[in-house]
């Protein structure tokens, strides 16, 4: 019994492992380029069976806890390995020994509490390494990165347990493009730990407290080009004179991101920035100012010249006591050399006139996503304000009048570029005043319905995209670039109004087509973006777009964004792939050809009808149909005549003087029906023929050469034949007045041929001695 239980347990384990392995394989997908993706697949281990064909492996967001020596042994060509957000707590020493080609390694946000230099020693090609978010306290007992000579981007540290930076941590690293250190809970920093790195393009430093900030600053000031401080509370920061003895600083840009600061500490920070002689750019992103704008220095403090700072950027600045914020006058003197200022989404509603006048070197001002209205803008753009300003961006403020906005900016004599997009202007006056040097105007997303002479004639670039325009008919002789996408235009603008146009972007309008002539009329056009319209793929449009090889050089979004909207059977297809049938593309020629063919067919039919008596056949067919439509007579018909005589008018002498005399004068006499004598006047001839045949016991046909030439004789023969077969009545009697060869009978007398082949006929004898027998036989035939 124990043995059986043991076997069952072993089998269960094997089956479980087999299912797990199968699940791992199913969660991994690889393409032909060796890019394998298995993220968020609930994997418990690295899938087996990985080969040298794998070049990129993404296993992020799984449940992998262990990496063994054999997991990646065969992946000798692996270039990128992403294992972020797993539960990895153990990596065997030689797990990466075969990854000499690996360039990108991401082990962030796992459970690695101890880092080993043996992991990274074989990774001679590594350029990117991310170790963020693992619960290690230090970066190991020995230098981890000394063998990574090609490393360019390094990210280390965590928010909670990484408390110590040692001098050996970054030994061997000489150049990095980006170094990110999450030292949020840093408690110990060994001097010169970061000084060993000779050059860092961008250093990102996460620090909750500022206690060790100055020590780190001393080490990096001569090696870092861009210093970024994140998540730091500088409310109580105090600057102390640095005893470094160094005057050369490499830092060109200093960024404060998600930093807390006060009026007093901001003054202290500025004293720190004074130590950076080469500082050109200062940036504050998502920061909080716990102050009211009181930046006055104490008697013992003095802010020295800010140096060469040219660019100031402030984004999403939060001021809790915004309603008490009152003064910037102490900073006026520090702004005279600044050339570029961006204050975005920070509730700015006014730039004091005095501050504007101090910004003498300002060339670029971006006040996007604020609260500016025309009245306050007029105060900001007062006389002598921003004398060097060339570019003004007031995107997404509260401007409502184009006319007032233009007049307000007249004081800015050097202004050339204005962006007032995403304001709600709705309408545009007929005329406006703008600075004389205006070259660029952005009116996109301003809800305007038309463009007028308010647009300055001096413009070289105009953006009116994402509005409600259905017509553009402005004469702008100097315009080189026109952005008019996402409107309601149905055709390209008139090229004669835009003689200098180089770039036209008119995508996502209501344009259905454009022609070669339209494009050729833009003599200087180099770039056209017209995709996203509902194109009618007519033959002319397709021929133009598919035959013009140079068109692809002009249409920058060709062919992906050019789709057919009609005809319906090609809707959604790319214009370059659509092929229409000959009938769709040459309809006029096809109709003309069909008409010609129909005319020839009618002509040929007429010739054939004339040659083969087709008209005669049609008349006969009509008579036949008329006869078929007549109501069927009852079997016991009202017989009025013994015989109806069908004969040619040229044989009337024989019929009237011989046949009639012989039969009607016989005792008992026969009553014959002759058309000359018995047809009812005023009645249709065909109806007379039909009625006479139906009222006669027999029908006598007097056959001769004259008979076969008579149309009416043919009708009488046809109706008699109809009676013969339709009523099963043997009523036809043939008299051959003169010999007729069957070959001489016309084709239209087909029924006569049939009757002569199936019935005996009486032949008029030339010998008078035999004529008595002829009359006897005829009388007998009529009586039968």
UniProtKB/Swiss-Prot annotation:
All copies of domain LRRCT, residue ranges: 525-579
Disulfide bonds: 30-36, 353-382, 432-454
Main localization of the protein described in the UniProt heading: membrane
GO cellular component: Golgi apparatus; membrane raft; phagocytic vesicle membrane; plasma membrane; receptor complex
Residue intervals passing through the bilayer: 588-608
SMART domains attached to this UniProt entry: LRR_BAC (SM00364), LRR_SD22 (SM00365), LRR_TYP (SM00369), LRRCT (SM00082), TIR (SM00255)
Example of a GO biological process term: cellular response to triacyl bacterial lipopeptide
Residues under site feature: Interaction with bacterial lipopeptide: 349
Localization in the cell: Membrane; Cytoplasmic vesicle, Phagosome membrane; Membrane raft
Bilayer topology annotation: Single-pass type I membrane protein
Post-translational modification: Ubiquitinated at Lys-754 by PPP1R11, leading to its degradation. Deubiquitinated by USP2.
Keywords: Cytoplasmic vesicle, Disulfide bond, Glycoprotein, Immunity, Inflammatory response, Innate immunity, Isopeptide bond, Leucine-rich repeat, Membrane, NAD, Receptor, Repeat, Signal, Transmembrane, Transmembrane helix, Ubl conjugation
Occurrences of domain TIR (ranges): 639-782
Cytoplasmic side: 609-784
Free-text comment about domains: Ester-bound lipid substrates are bound through a crevice formed between the LRR 11 and LRR 12. The ATG16L1-binding motif mediates interaction with ATG16L1.
PANTHER family referenced in this protein's UniProt entry, alphabetically: TOLL-LIKE RECEPTOR, TOLL-LIKE RECEPTOR 2
Record's function text: Cooperates with LY96 to mediate the innate immune response to bacterial lipoproteins and other microbial cell wall components. Cooperates with TLR1 or TLR6 to mediate the innate immune response to bacterial lipoproteins or lipopeptides. Acts via MYD88 and TRAF6, leading to NF-kappa-B activation, cytokine secretion and the inflammatory response. May also promote apoptosis in response to lipoproteins.
Protein name (Swiss-Prot/TrEMBL): Toll-like receptor 2
Species name: Pan troglodytes
Lineage: Eukaryota, Metazoa, Chordata, Craniata, Vertebrata
């Amino acid at each position: 019994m124990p043995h059986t239980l043991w076997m069952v347990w072993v089998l269960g384990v094997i089956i479980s492992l087999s299912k797990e392995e199968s699940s791992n394989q199913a969660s991994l997908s690889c393409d032909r380029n060796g890019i394998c993706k298995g993220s968020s697949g609930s994997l418990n281990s690295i899938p087996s069976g990985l080969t040298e064909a794998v070049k990129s492996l993404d296993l992020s967001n799984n449940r992998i806890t262990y990496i063994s020596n054999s997991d990646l042994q065969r992946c000798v060509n692996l270039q990128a390995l992403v294992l972020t957000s797993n539960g990895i707590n153990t990596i065997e020493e030689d797990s990466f020994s075969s990854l000499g080609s690996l360039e990108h390694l991401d082990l962030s946000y796992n459970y690695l509490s101890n880092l080993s230099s043996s992991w990274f020693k074989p990774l001679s090609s590594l350029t990117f390494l991310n170790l963020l978010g693992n619960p290690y306290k230090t970066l190991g007992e020995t230098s981890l990165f000394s063998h990574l000579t090609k490393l360019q981007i390094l990210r280390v540290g965590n928010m909670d347990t990484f408390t110590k930076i040692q001098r050996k941590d970054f030994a061997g690293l000489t150049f990095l493009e980006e170094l990110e250190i999450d030292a949020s809970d840093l408690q110990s920093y060994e001097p010169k730990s970061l000084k060993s790195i000779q050059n860092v393009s961008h250093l990102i430093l996460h620090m909750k407290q500022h206690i060790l900030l100055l020590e780190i600053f001393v080490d990096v000031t001569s090696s870092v080009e861009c210093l970024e401080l994140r998540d730091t509370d500088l409310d109580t920061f105090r600057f102390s004179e640095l005893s470094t003895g160094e005057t050369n600083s490499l830092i060109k840009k200093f960024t404060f991101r998600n930093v807390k600061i006060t009026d007093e500490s901001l003054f202290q920070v500025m004293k720190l920035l004074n130590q950076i002689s080469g500082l050109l750019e200062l940036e504050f992103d998502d920061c909080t100012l716990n102050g009211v704008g009181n930046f006055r220095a104490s008697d013992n403090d003095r802010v020295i010249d800010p140096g060469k700072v040219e660019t100031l950027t402030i984004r999403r600045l939060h001021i809790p006591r915004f309603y008490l914020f009152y003064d910037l006058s102490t900073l006026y003197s520090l702004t005279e050399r600044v050339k570029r200022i961006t204050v975005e989404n920070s509730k700015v509603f006014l730039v004091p006139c005095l501050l504007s006048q101090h910004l003498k070197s300002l060339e670029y001002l971006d006040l996007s996503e604020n609260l500016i209205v025309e009245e306050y803008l007029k105060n900001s753009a007062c006389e002598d304000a921003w004398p060097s300003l060339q570019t003004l961006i007031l995107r997404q403020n509260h401007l409502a009048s184009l006319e007032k906005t233009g007049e307000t900016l007249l004081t800015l004599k050097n202004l050339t570029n204005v962006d007032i997009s995403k304001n709600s202007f709705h309408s545009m006056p007929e005329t406006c005043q703008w600075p004389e040097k205006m070259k660029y105007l952005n009116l996109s997303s301003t809800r305007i319905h038309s463009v007028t002479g308010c647009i300055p004639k001096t413009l070289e670039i105009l953006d009116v995209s994402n509005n409600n325009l259905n017509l553009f008919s402005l004469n702008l002789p100097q315009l080189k670039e026109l952005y008019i996408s996402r409107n309601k235009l149905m055709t390209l603008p008139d090229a004669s109004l835009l003689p200098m146009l180089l770039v036209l972007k008119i995508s996502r309008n209501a344009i259905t087509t454009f022609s070669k002539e339209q494009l050729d009329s833009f003599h200087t056009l180099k770039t056209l973006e017209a995709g996203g319209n509902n194109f009618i793929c007519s033959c002319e449009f397709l021929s133009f777009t598919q035959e013009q090889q140079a068109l692809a050089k002009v249409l920058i979004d060709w062919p992906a964004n050019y789709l057919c909207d009609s005809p319906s059977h090609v809707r959604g297809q790319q214009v370059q792939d659509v092929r229409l049938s000959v009938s769709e593309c040459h309809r006029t020629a096809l109709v003309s050809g069909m008409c010609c063919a129909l005319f020839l067919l009618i002509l040929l039919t007429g010739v054939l009808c004339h040659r083969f008596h087709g008209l005669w056949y049609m008349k006969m067919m009509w008579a036949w149909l008329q006869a078929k439509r007549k109501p069927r007579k009852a079997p016991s018909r009202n017989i009025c005549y013994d015989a109806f005589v069908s004969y040619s008018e040229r044989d009337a002498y024989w019929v009237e003087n011989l046949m009639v005399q012989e039969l009607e004068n016989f005792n008992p006499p026969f009553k014959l029906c002759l058309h000359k004598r018995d047809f009812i006047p005023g009645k249709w001839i065909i109806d007379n023929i039909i009625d006479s045949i139906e009222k006669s016991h027999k029908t006598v046909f007097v056959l001769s050469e004259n008979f076969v030439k008579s149309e009416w004789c043919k009708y009488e023969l046809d109706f008699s034949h109809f009676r013969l077969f339709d009523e099963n009545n043997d009523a036809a009697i043939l008299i051959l007045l003169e010999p007729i060869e069957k070959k001489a009978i016309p084709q239209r007398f087909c029924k006569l041929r049939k009757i002569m082949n199936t019935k005996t006929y009486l032949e008029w004898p030339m010998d008078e001695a035999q004529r008595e027998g002829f009359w006897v036989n005829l009388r007998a035939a009529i009586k039968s």
